[in-house]
Amino acid sequence: MKKLLTSWWIALGLISTPALANKGIAFVHGTGMQTDAYNDYWTGDFVHSVSQGLNDSSMYTVINCDFDQFMWDQKAAGCLAEQLSSFINDKNISEMIVITHSNGGNVIRWIMSNPTFDSRYPAIINATSKVIALAPSSLGTPLADAVHQGNVFESSLGWLLGYGSDAVKQQQVSWMHYYNQNFLNGTAGRPALAKPFKAVVGSDVDSAFWDGDSYCAGYQYQVALETTQNWLDSCSDGFLNCSSQAGAGTVWFTDKQRTRGREPLSHQQSRRDCFNLDVILRNDI
């Protein structure tokens, strides 16, 4: 009788235990055409550190697409959809966390907001558990306006934004307002996104040469972003106003609320392992 009961409880346990989710991470870069985003955009240190939050730290993919195009372009959202679909199918991913940076947040929002635009979109949305949007350009940036108009900042911003590409046009403030009002969900007055879109907001740039923290992710970039910050609000990461970064979904946190030493995250630093950002992401995963 004891053996019978034991067998019964074992069988019941096997039946009632839910299947473990096969969790994975997709790293989605920002503006620009990437062929090796693992090394050139994120760095292996950042990717590996964040991925330690997974049961299997090898279950990640790093996207390489042409985000110099409009977000809906086949080379942008189409490429992203193809690579995400392959990741989901090849690795049997049932719970995908998408980590985006800058304009990458707009491309994934396009997919989440327009499920009938491409037959691959619904499966991607279903597999996605949440989007962690690092410094997303949800409401655009005045710097895109300046670059598109041929301002003197064009040459100094090329490393960050590109030179007069469609993605630059798209991120002009008035253009993003139009897209948010008509094609993208998650902003004020629009339907909510199908899955959580958690924004991490960068609020300032430090470039003091005597401060070692200014050298994280490259001192020269900090100096450049400190300069461009003069065109932005007092709360900005050198490329985006805080209001733009907070414009879609919900704000998870503003840098100083959680970073080591309450350090700000510039637009360059918010895609690198600076001030425990990688650890914060890892723990959330």
Model-based region annotation:
Residues 1-8:
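Bacterial N-terminal signal peptides that target proteins for export
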Residues 16-18:
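N-terminal signal peptide c-region/cleavage motif recognized by signal peptidases
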Residues 22-96:
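Active-site catalytic motif of lipid deacylating hydrolases and related acyltransferases
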Residues 25, 29, 77-183:
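Serine-dependent carboxylesterase/thioesterase catalytic core
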Residues 31-33, 67-68, 103-105, 137-139, ...:
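Short, solvent-exposed loop/turn segments at secondary-structure junctions
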Residues 36-40, 110-111, 142-146, 210-212:
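Short, solvent-exposed loop/turn and secondary-structure capping segments
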Residues 49-55, 124, 189-191, 249:
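Short, conserved catalytic or adaptor-binding loops enriched in Gly and charged residues
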Residues 190-285:
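C-terminal catalytic-base region of ester-bond hydrolases, centering on the histidine
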